[in-house]
């Protein structure tokens, strides 16, 4: 099969499995008309699953990927009793701060590569559009972007796995990431840290383990409520990074919000906890 689009950076086609015309065997894949091709298999497939189709895609960096669609009976996940819970407050600079005071310390893969990307973009601007040199430079930039995406996904998978292993209930805010990404002040940070992707990973990992992700209302004033006395502080500017209350409470603004998010999530779930567990 041939890809039809010349402009779309991600080109793909999908084919259905009919009469066994798609076969996966010993790190080799048989596709209609393409025959047998060698692949790097991401993970092993359970023999009970039924192969339904395949989607072959060519990314902007010229690498080919195939996604296989399988059908299987959805397993019943045993709901585990909640013994441990944590609240996560979204942070522009660190991905999140949790209710135990721990910071994710997100590596900022895109920002670290910005200088190199800008240099390669300048070189591209000096090439004649459509020339072989132009296409070669364009692919080089695409490879850089693909590398950043892989770094980000790897980090977010590991971070979400760590949390899913330790906690039975995870509480977060329902944020409109699309709206935030369009803000000139936050756009780059929102795209860089991948909070939406992180929460998606966290959601399915928790579900598979019989655990739960609770999203609290985005209008809940988690940053303005004192986590010690419960008093609402009406005047709180975005640049105020330390939360100070008349009761004497003084702590990191995001940590204070994370504690409130955790408590609100527990309230919504109807769960009471006497113990806490921290990630070691």
Predicted features along the sequence, with ranges:
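Nucleic-acid substrate recognition interfaces
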Residues: 1-280
